[in-house]
Amino acid sequence: MAYEHILAERQGAVLVLTLNRPDRLNAAPPALFDELRDALTRLDGARAVLLAGAGRAFCSGADVGGGALGADDPGEATYAALTDQYNPTMLAIADLGVPVVSAVRGPAAGIGCSLALAADFCVASETAYFLQAFVNIGLVPDGGASWMLPRLIGRARAAEMMLLGERVPAAKALDWGMHPPVVAAEARDARAAAMGPRRAAAPTVP
């Protein structure tokens, strides 16, 4: 598969997958998740995966405008995207046999929040924030967020995120236990990149 929305690059034993729509803050059309899922089936011996976003954002959420869903009925198209593309990709990450590290700067919103937190490790810069804004547009959290968030940060804090639809800055997310220690923006990629090889070099069961 030729990739239009992501970059896939091997760095030693680490497969680096970069959401590559910086002009849209890496807003993710359904096809992007097809590409991610395809890339995850092509580890070719990689022992860790690093997820990142090009530019100043990790992922600003699903791109549902401009015909991205490709259907006249938004409800049916959204359901199809969730069941055929978004959710299967989240399950593919959960079932992957190697560690996944996400490197977050700027927004990790909506499905982008779920994608970041689905990783085994989430490295967040000082500019990062996490957002569940579905309540503001009359939708429910997607990408497994309603299952994942209560288990990461507890029911009350998950409810606060999902019912208020407010940004959770990196420092607050750290206090809540959502991710490892915050790092400076310029160090985010270095730390995330270092974690990938470290996990890749760890021993495995024969």
Feature locations, PLM:
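Conserved CoA-thioester-binding segment of acyl-CoA-metabolizing enzymes
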Residues: M1-A54, L91
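Hydrophobic/aromatic residues within transmembrane alpha-helices
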Residues: L17, L51, D63, L115-L117, ...
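Histidine-centered beta-alpha loop that forms part of the nucleotide-sugar donor binding/catalytic region
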Residues: N20, A62, R105
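Hydrophobic alpha-helical membrane-association signature
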Residues: L32-E35, L82-Q85, R188
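Glycine- (often His-adjacent) and acidic-residue-rich active-site loop
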Residues: G45, G53-A92, A108
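Crotonase-fold acyl-CoA enzyme core
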Residues: L91-V205
